A protein has these predicted regions:
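Acidic, polar-rich low-complexity tracts and alpha-helical solenoid repeat scaffolds
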Residues: 2, 21-137
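Sec-dependent bacterial lipoprotein signal peptides
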Residues: 1-23
Length: 137
């Protein structure tokens, strides 16, 4: 019985230790002079370590601070959609991907990087399949 309690205690301590490593920055804690590449790198590092909430904060910071930079914003939007896919939040991903595709089919499309259109279409189709939604192809 004591061994069982010890094992549970060790598991709880390990879980708390892992949770403390997954800190999520507040937007106010992110340096005001951080550039798009800085924020993207921080987001990617958070993503690679499995801290999707922190990655999302960095991408959302790009959307807020660099709203006039269409290229940076479409990349951040796509990455947020990808975060939703990783967490199997298909509805959220689908909605964002739909908006990205609409941007590429609008008048500002020539200013956007073509790679994200292709990636968004692929993930959009995948999300639609998961949600059992028929798409126009």
């Amino acid at each position: 019985m004591k061994i069982k309690h010890t094992v549970y205690l060790c598991c709880a301590i390990m879980a708390l230790s892992l949770a403390s490593c997954m800190t999520v920055p507040k937007e106010s804690e992110i340096p005001a002079d951080a550039t798009v590449p800085d924020l993207t790198q921080k987001a990617q590092e958070a993503f690679d370590s499995g801290n999707y909430r922190a990655a999302r904060v960095y991408y959302e910071t790009i959307l807020k601070r660099f709203a006039d930079d269409e290229k940076a914003c479409v990349a951040a939007q796509y990455e947020i959609a990808h975060l939703h896919i990783k967490r199997r939040r298909w509805n959220d991903a689908y909605t964002i991907l739909e908006k990205i595709i609409a941007q590429y089919e609008g008048p500002m499309a020539m200013h956007l990087p073509p790679d994200y259109y292709k990636l968004a279409k692929i993930d959009y189709t995948r999300a639609a399949e998961k949600l059992r939604i028929k798409t126009k192809q």
